[in-house]
């Protein structure tokens, strides 16, 4: 006899990215341009702090929200970027994923709605649905991956509780411009909804003039939750460390969810986290910038249209002219060219693929060469595909 489980979780699909990587693993020598994980080791000065912490026996329960000294350091770090949150308004989390989970667990009631501009990290939808709420998708492709205010307003209903924005964006690498941020602010203020800012890529920006939502609109701090991560800027994906910041009344409720989800982040990583805040990620950024230029040049030579990424380490070229779904394109690329990419349907946007350039230079060049050869063999678009693209949506992970 099979006993019933959570019906909300039953509707969720496994990560599409992980599935693509599993398929790639079945093909020896496959070059994976799929997973968003830096190829650099964590800087030694950060790792050394863990060794020191273990040597002195720092293996006991820490405060739920993180040690006061670390939260002070996080507050100061955010202050340097123009975001004003006190140490008491900061929680150290078990990665940005847990920060998102705790935020939505604290925020959502059954039947609430969360606006998710697409393309977007599939985890947002999964967490929203797991909390018995509804994801409402805002297609940003017609606006070159910016926020059209009229389209955003059309998504708002009496049930709307929040909007999630990610800038720089995963999977496009695009940055929301001032007009987009202002549109979100106006709608959020007028509708009385939260703005959840997934800012995990904010240190990986290639252009001047980048602004974060909380920096540009401090007047909405009571409605804003900021989420950051140690994973991307300092190559600490396996550490599972992140943090979130929000106004005191909001953080008090999120702290309850955080406590019951994970109790706390890892005690012997906290000094390392504080040390990371002092490490300049610019050397890694310079490498990513050079790789980005090579990728854009290669995509141009292949005749693939792409909105130039201004941050993160992804591109999101269009493959519409080939008349294939993004899923079919990526499966064929693995089987026929031994190169792995992520289908756009993982992010809620068909007709595109995500290409990650946080891999070694050797693998990147070989992967681009294989992709170029594969593209040259694809038939040009001849007629619309009869397949239901919406039905092929898959959640993404990392």
What residue spans do the PLM features occupy?
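N-terminal small-domain helix-loop-helix segment of the aminotransferase-like
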Residues: 5-95, 102, 276-279, 283
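Helix C-cap/helix->beta junction micro-motif
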Residues: 27, 131, 190-191, 302, ...
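PLP-dependent aminotransferase class I/II
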Residues: 43, 223-311
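PLP-dependent aminotransferase-like
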Residues: 88, 106-165, 178
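Active-site phosphate-binding strand-loop segment of PLP-dependent enzymes
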Residues: 140-214
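Conserved PLP-binding active-site segment of the aspartate aminotransferase-like
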Residues: 246-247, 316-323, 337-368, 372-374
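Conserved PLP-binding catalytic core of the aspartate aminotransferase-like
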Residues: 288-289, 302-336, 353, 361
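Conserved small/polar residues in nucleotide/adenosyl-binding loops
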Residues: 381-386
């Amino acid at each position: 006899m099979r006993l019933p489980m959570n019906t909300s979780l039953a509707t969720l699909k496994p990560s599409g990215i992980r599935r693509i990587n599993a398929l790639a693993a079945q093909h020896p020598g496959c070059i994976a341009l799929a997973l968003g994980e830096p190829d650099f080791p964590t800087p030694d000065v950060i790792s050394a702090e863990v060794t020191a912490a273990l040597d002195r026996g720092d293996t006991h329960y820490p405060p739920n929200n993180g040690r006061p000294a670390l939260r002070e350091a996080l507050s100061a770090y955010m202050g340097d970027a123009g975001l004003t949150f006190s140490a008491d308004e900061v929680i150290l989390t078990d990665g940005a994923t847990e920060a998102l989970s705790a935020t939505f667990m604290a925020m959502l009631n059954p039947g609430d709605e969360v606006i998710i501009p697409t393309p977007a990290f599939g985890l947002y939808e999964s967490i929203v649905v797991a909390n018995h709420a509804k994801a409402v998708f805002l297609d940003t492709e017609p606006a070159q991956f910016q926020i059209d205010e009229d389209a955003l307003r059309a998504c708002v209903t009496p049930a709307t509780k929040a909007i999630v924005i990610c800038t720089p964006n995963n999977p496009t690498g695009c940055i929301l411009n001032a007009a987009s941020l202002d549109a979100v602010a106006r709608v959020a203020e007028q509708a009385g909804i939260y703005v959840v800012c997934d800012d995990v890529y904010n240190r990986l920006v290639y252009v001047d003039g980048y602004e974060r939502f909380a920096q540009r609109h401090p007047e909405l701090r009571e409605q804003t939750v900021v989420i950051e991560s140690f994973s991307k800027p300092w190559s600490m994906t396996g550490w599972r460390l992140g943090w979130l910041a929000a106004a005191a009344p909001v953080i008090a409720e999120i702290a309850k969810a955080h406590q019951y989800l994970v109790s706390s982040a890892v005690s012997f990583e906290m000094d390392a986290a504080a040390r990371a805040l002092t490490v300049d990620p610019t050397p890694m950024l310079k490498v990513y910038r050079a790789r980005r230029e090579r990728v854009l040049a290669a995509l141009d030579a292949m005749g693939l249209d792409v909105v130039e990424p201004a941050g993160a380490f992804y591109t999101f070229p269009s493959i519409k002219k080939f008349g294939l779904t993004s899923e079919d394109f990526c499966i064929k690329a693995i089987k026929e060219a031994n190169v792995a990419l992520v289908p756009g349907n993982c992010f809620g946007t068909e007709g595109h693929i995500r290409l990650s350039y946080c891999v070694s230079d050797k693998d990147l060049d070989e992967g681009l060469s294989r992709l170029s050869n594969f593209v040259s063999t694809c038939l040009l678009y001849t007629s619309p595909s009869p397949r239901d693209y919406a039905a092929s949506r898959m959640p993404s992970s990392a």
